[in-house]
Amino acid sequence: MTVPQLAFVFPGQGSQSIGMLAGLAEAHAVVRESFEEASQGAGVDLWALAQQGPEEQLNQTEFTQPALLAAGIAVWRAWQAAGGAQPALLAGHSLGEYAALVAAGAMSLEDGARLVRLRGRLMQDAAPAGTGAMAAVLGAEDALVEEVCREASQDGIVVPANHNSPGQIVIGGHAAAVERALALLGERGVRKAVKLAVSVPSHTPLMREAANRLDEAMANVAWNEPAIPVVQNVDAQVHEGVQAIRDALVRQLYLPVQWTGCVQALATAGATRIGECGPGKVLSGLARRIDKGLDARALGTPGDFEAALGAWAG
């Protein structure tokens, strides 16, 4: 039964860890089955990688992406198998948008895993090690961050890449430009701005060529109309039609993730409950920060999963 007040969100890179979903897999066979299906598309044993590592490989973006896609769909299918309420809307953060579209039936898990492994490889190739950087900026107004990025982009590019919640923005671009932006932010009194352990500046213009090649690869995917609307990152809108959905996915790679807007769009559409489909609790935490009235819960452990099943049964 579809519940208008319920929306599900799928996390992106940063939520992976060795041993993720091990407990849920013991209780729900479909978790491991989902990883096995995704492995067919990715061409690598994703369950073994997620459980045993090596961690260095799991954290390489071309492997992180299919592993997290598998994890998101594993939790989604476990929820379906357990008879959980059907959400009225879906969204995913960056890579998580692909999981949302797989969950909605827009593409198969196997196709999705193949596509996001390629996406990761293209992203790595677009910014050789040491050329790109990203940093989290906390407690600063959007307008200030945007102004500083413009000032720091005199030689090289730095732009806002993720609008994660009010007062939490990730910037990205050429490494030297990111360093200049951090220095300027410090001069403007911003005390919490830290570089991230990420070398690929996703959601910045440096990914434009990768996006073009990703667009070409999308022609090899069998697309369907989503059975559940998906709010997409580029503009926090639901797009109608396969071509419009594809275009939004391509643009997502070089434009900022409007995550604050996505969560606000879910709430405006009537969502009061948000379930995080995947490992970790990043998105449920952001959702509560964006809208304190939301009942946002993680679903990635047996305890959290069962608690949400019980709380959202009616």
Could you tell me what each predicted segment is?
Residues 80, 186, 264-270:
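Non-catalytic positions within long, well-ordered alpha-helices that form the structural scaffold/packing
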Residues 257-265:
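A short, well-structured juxtamembrane/interface segment
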Residues 26, 151-153, 186-188, 284, ...:
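Short, solvent-exposed amphipathic alpha-helical segments in soluble enzyme
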Residues 177-178, 217, 302-303, 307-314:
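NAD(P)-dependent dehydrogenase/reductase Rossmann-like domain
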Residues 13-15, 40-42, 104-255:
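Alpha/beta catalytic cores of group-transfer enzymes, especially the acyltransferase/condensing modules
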Residues 1-145, 196, 273-307:
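FabD-like malonyl-/acyl-CoA
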